[in-house]
């Protein structure tokens, strides 16, 4: 895809899948079929116990490893939690923040997301901040109203000089893990709206520069049509990122020029 002002990012989200041993097997197969030459930015966000294995395996490549969540606090009595500094020291470049599954299952709020975004940026991580609407919100016609509020709250306190480090992922909740996918036109409409929100909060220059991903059941079959849209700069990939061949096909789709 041709992106004059911004990066194309293909990010995998493994969720709670794969052991360290399975991660090693995946990385071996993945490296063997990675496209040659220049290609888009690629991230693999893996379970915490798999991060060291993934970092070691991808050290000689341009693939960045990321985490699926983090705690906003620097340290302390937070049993079971992982800090941003722990992630950077382990070799992470990215971290997913505010995924709908975290919001729904664990009660994460926009304020929680905001605290994590600020902490991630200060630690040198690239936050992939998620936003999206339920089917009920879409049918009620309040999709952009809801998403605009998520973005405004999530980016509160993020300075002009750091906003371009943030990646925003639009994930229609009704399309995650359901096999349903927003049409390219539906996804484009929302991603364009997200860029408009960033323009209001910051500037046209920053809105042009920020990467907006689509994260609702993108796969190797629909990737090209979604990525051909002018305001969709990549994908946050779930199930398809667990299979090396499928993930590589999405990367290849992102590298194809559009008409």
Task: Give a label for each model feature.
Residues 1-259:
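Active-site loop-to-helix "anion-binding N-cap" substructures in soluble metabolic enzymes
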């Amino acid at each position: 895809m041709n992106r004059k002002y911004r990066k194309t990012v293909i990010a995998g989200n493994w969720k709670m899948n794969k052991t360290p041993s399975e991660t090693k097997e995946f990385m071996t197969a993945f490296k063997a079929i990675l496209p040659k030459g220049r290609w888009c930015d690629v991230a693999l966000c893996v379970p915490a116990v798999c991060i060291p294995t993934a970092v070691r395996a991808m050290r000689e490549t341009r693939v960045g490893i990321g985490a699926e969540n983090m705690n906003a606090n620097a340290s302390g009595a937070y049993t079971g939690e992982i800090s941003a500094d722990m992630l950077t020291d382990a070799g992470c470049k990215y971290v997913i923040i505010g995924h709908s599954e975290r919001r729904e299952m664990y009660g994460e709020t926009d304020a929680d997301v905001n605290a994590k975004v600020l902490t991630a940026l200060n630690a040198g991580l690239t936050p992939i901040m998620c936003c999206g609407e339920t089917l009920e919100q879409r049918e009620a016609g309040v999709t952009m109203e809801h998403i605009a509020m998520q973005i405004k709250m999530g980016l509160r306190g993020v300075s002009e000089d750091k906003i371009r480090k943030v990646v925003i992922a639009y994930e229609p909740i009704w399309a995650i893990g359901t096999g349903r996918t927003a049409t390219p036109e539906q996804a484009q409409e929302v991603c364009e709206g997200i860029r408009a929100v960033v323009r209001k909060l910051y500037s046209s220059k920053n809105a042009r520069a920020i990467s907006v991903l689509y994260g609702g059941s993108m796969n190797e079959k629909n990737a090209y049509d979604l990525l051909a849209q002018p305001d969709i700069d990549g994908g946050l990939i779930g199930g398809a990122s667990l299979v090396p061949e499928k993930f590589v096909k999405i990367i290849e789709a992102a590298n194809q020029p559009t008409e």
